[in-house]
């Protein structure tokens, strides 16, 4: 289902549909041992997260840094347990006010109704600009490459 969404969780539910088990909490969308990869992450940002707890810690650090107005699901390409989808978001850096208008390609693998692997492709230059540059962004993010 393409269209606009208020939250990233709603966008995931729209993109993955009935492949996802119904859940109450956003983090329950992800398997306990989820692998989250950011192939284009800039220096100082994690390139890989291992496990739901690591994802939760990452989101706790990242959440206050960016403000989102909306998410728009553009296209969805399902293929068995893997779904590729393209989406965009409109927002800004919380401290800088700089635009965070990002486009993503996500490759998601599901297992037993949960996200087991998520590869997130996005433009790091847009993120760095929104956060105030490389040094500021790395300091804000914490700079840990792998959490587990």
Language-model region placement:
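Short, flexible active-site loop motifs that bind/organize anionic cofactors or intermediates
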Residues: 16, 45, 117
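Residue-level detector of alpha-helix boundaries and kinks
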Residues: 10-11, 19, 40-43, 93
């Amino acid at each position: 289902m393409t269209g606009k969404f208020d939250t990233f969780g709603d966008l995931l539910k729209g993109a993955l549909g009935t492949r996802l088990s119904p859940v109450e909490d956003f983090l329950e969308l992800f398997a306990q041992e989820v692998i989250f990869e950011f192939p284009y992450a800039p220096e100082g940002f994690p390139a890989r997260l291992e496990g739901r707890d690591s994802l939760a810690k990452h989101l706790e650090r990242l959440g206050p840094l960016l403000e989102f107005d909306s998410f728009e699901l553009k296209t969805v390409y399902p293929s068995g347990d893997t779904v590729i989808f393209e989406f965009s978001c409109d927002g800004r850096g919380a401290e800088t006010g700089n635009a965070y208008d990002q486009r993503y390609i996500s490759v998601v693998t599901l297992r037993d109704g949960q996200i087991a692997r998520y590869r997130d492709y996005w433009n790091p230059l847009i993120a760095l600009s929104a956060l105030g540059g490389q040094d500021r962004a790395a300091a804000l993010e914490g700079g840990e490459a792998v959490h587990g």
